[in-house]
Amino acid sequence: MEKYENLGLVGEGSYGMVMKCRNKDTGRIVAIKKFLESDDDKMVKKIAMREIKLLKQLRHENLVNLLEVCKKKKRWYLVFEFVDHTILDDLELFPNGLDYQVVQKYLFQIINGIGFCHSHNIIHRDIKPENILVSQSGVVKLCDFGFARTLAAPGEVYTDYVATRWYRAPELLVGDVKYGKAVDVWAIGCLVTEMFMGEPLFPGDSDIDQLYHIMMCLGNLIPRHQELFNKNPVFAGVRLPEIKEREPLERRYPKLSEVVIDLAKKCLHIDPDKRPFCAELLHHDFFQMDGFAERFSQELQLKVQKDARNVSLSKKSQNRKKEKEKDDSLVEERKTLVVQDTNADPKIKDYKLFKIKGSKIDGEKAEKGNRASNASCLHDSRTSHNKIVPSTSLKDCSNVSVDHTRNPSVAIPPLTHNLSAVAPSINSGMGTETIPIQGYRVDEKTKKCSIPFVKPNRHSPSGIYNINVTTLVSGPPLSDDSGADLPQMEHQH
């Protein structure tokens, strides 16, 4: 980690912090996620190892790319490329919602990235605006895989996890331990309306209140989930809310088009078995009308290539700067040597000092013409110029090799932004920027940004119930995170 210069704190949370750093060799700006002393905290170690393992396996244009992993003094360090903009930033800048074309491009990439994870039997489990990054070119990146995991084998159950309540599917809220990919699809449905309208769809302030919001919009839970709710000791003495009159999506958001409402409804089906797969969502009319999917797929590849070129140009610029600094230092060194040499030959002392004060070229001509032997000596004493080549190979400081030679994309795990050090970029055409009024997003999210390590506990307008659920699990602990050895990088082409 000595090769990185710390430029300041980006954010911090319960499990660690993220720092903005510069690679001293290449000048490249990166984000380094530093976990707490994971050897002393089993939960921190579990989260760190899970994120490292999954990010090493997954390589996709819409997923954050892990550049390097180090372990120093019982702490894990994850090195990512630096990006300081998320969809949450867009929603705070444009509280009335984003433009149709922007939402269309964002959702296409979000579903594309989640679908890639699902094709490798991995569920993210914490999809939300602050975990979706956006590069300067508009490339979306899913990040923060600390709660992601592989799908359970038949008969195996999942352990409970702490994720953002507003985007939890009903099966998670009632304590079902046999959930699957459908929980990510539910979160997509929540994002659909939030990006268009600028407000969260189900802003519950407790698990039972969250269920109330869901049932008010979508109706009663399926029988299996009702049974799980009644058997869950956390809800002992509590009944599911009785819904006298529903407020469906089309009534709540009359300005949204039918195709948008239909996309959201499909993702938010109360029965997880009836929610579509990501591949089906990409063929929805919302993406297929006017040839958007085919046209944007080509545009996306150009955006990815542009980001890669920007990284390459940045490296070359830094290298040229460092070589210029070396050249300047050599000139100063030569001047010093020439001045020292005049002490041995007083007859030419005044002449040499006069030439040194002149231009660099004049000084070199004088040396070549009048002091050939001295110039030869200086030539031998020069430091050779070594070209600095941006390194693409990854080295684990804990003797774990990582080989990543592909062009990395630009991403950073999100944490609370320190706006004094990091100013988010604003994409044009995003929407109409207004001065935020006092409300749930201003009260809770203007603390500079969200902290993904510390899950939000914001209040809902209804606030009818106030009971949190914790799933009771009797199954064995996860085996995929307990290993102390860092897994080898596996590229997915």
Swiss-Prot record:
Motif ([NKR]KIAxRE): 45-51
Domain Protein kinase: 4-287
Entry-linked InterPro entries: CDK, Kinase-like_dom_sf, Prot_kinase_dom, Protein_kinase_ATP_BS, Ser/Thr_kinase_AS
Keyword Nucleotide-binding among record annotations: yes
GO cellular component assignments: centrosome; cytoplasm; nucleoplasm; nucleus
Main location: cytoplasm
GO MF term list: ATP binding; cyclin-dependent protein serine/threonine kinase activity; protein kinase activity; protein serine kinase activity; protein serine/threonine kinase activity
Alphabetical list of Pfam families matching this protein: Pkinase
EC annotation from Swiss-Prot or TrEMBL: 2.7.11.22
Binding site for ATP: 10-18, 33
Keyword GTP-binding (UniProt): no
Tissue/organ expression: Expressed in testis and kidney, and at lower level in brain and lung.
Membrane-traversing stretches: none
Catalytic activity reported: L-seryl-[protein] + ATP = O-phospho-L-seryl-[protein] + ADP + H(+); L-threonyl-[protein] + ATP = O-phospho-L-threonyl-[protein] + ADP + H(+)
GO BP annotations listed: sex differentiation; signal transduction
Localization of this protein: Cytoplasm; Nucleus
Phenotype upon changing residue 149 to Q: In an ovarian mucinous carcinoma sample; somatic mutation
Region (Disordered): 363-384
Residues the record marks as active site: 126
Family statement drawn from the similarity comment of this UniProt entry: Belongs to the protein kinase superfamily. CMGC Ser/Thr protein kinase family. CDC2/CDKX subfamily.
Domain comment in the entry: The [NKR]KIAxRE motif seems to be a cyclin-binding region.
Record's protein name: Cyclin-dependent kinase-like 2
Taxonomic source organism: Homo sapiens
Lineage: Eukaryota, Metazoa, Chordata, Craniata, Vertebrata
Gene: CDKL2
